[in-house]
Regions:
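Viral RNA-dependent RNA polymerase
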Residues: 1-172
């Protein structure tokens, strides 16, 4: 990354280097052709103090895959986050806020609800469930007039995420 002149809106302004932009263009061209990129996802331990028996893991994408996910899915996810009672999605809602209380009251009016936050979900979640989540976002993208080409990219990208190759301590 190369720093560039800051602005009021972007005080830490930068541009991505040509090598990174070329990788992003490669990912996009492969996805547009319906070919997976098989990007490696790195699993790494969190830098936290825990008991000897507990070690928390998180997953890291490279910047090209992150760029693609954010380009195609972030506008829809942002919309869902902005309207938690409409989307019934509490990601990003402060649990000590009035918005949380409104969401709680709304959800309790209905007899069926799912608590989607459960222990070790990122280690146990099946690919089919990941793909189902992406499918919902893709259906919303269709309703938002995404092009068929963009939908195709999103579906191929979803497969790369759902069936990811994860590298942990150098092992795949």
């Amino acid at each position: 990354m190369t720093p560039i002149a800051p602005t009021d809106d972007y005080p830490d302004n930068f541009v991505l280097d040509d090598e990174i932009m070329e990788e992003i263009r490669y990912y996009e061209s492969e996805y547009r052709c319906g070919r997976r990129v098989y990007s490696l996802i790195k699993a790494t331990t969190k830098d936290e103090i825990h008991t000897k028996d507990k070690c928390r893991i998180f997953y890291v994408n490279n910047i090209a895959l992150t760029w693609m996910i954010r380009k195609y899915y972030l506008p829809i996810i942002r919309f869902l986050q902005m309207f938690p009672t409409l989307s019934e999605c509490a990601v990003g809602v402060n649990s000590e806020s009035q918005e949380w209380q409104q969401l709680d009251a709304f959800m309790k009016r209905h007899p069926n609800l799912i608590g989607g936050d459960y222990s070790k979900y990122d280690q146990k979640i099946p690919a089919q469930l990941i793909l189902a989540g992406f499918k919902i976002l893709t259906l919303l993208a269709r309703r938002c007039n995404y092009s068929e080409e963009d939908i195709f990219v999103m579906e191929t990208l979803a497969a790369d995420v759902a069936y990811a190759y994860v590298m942990f301590n150098g092992d795949l």
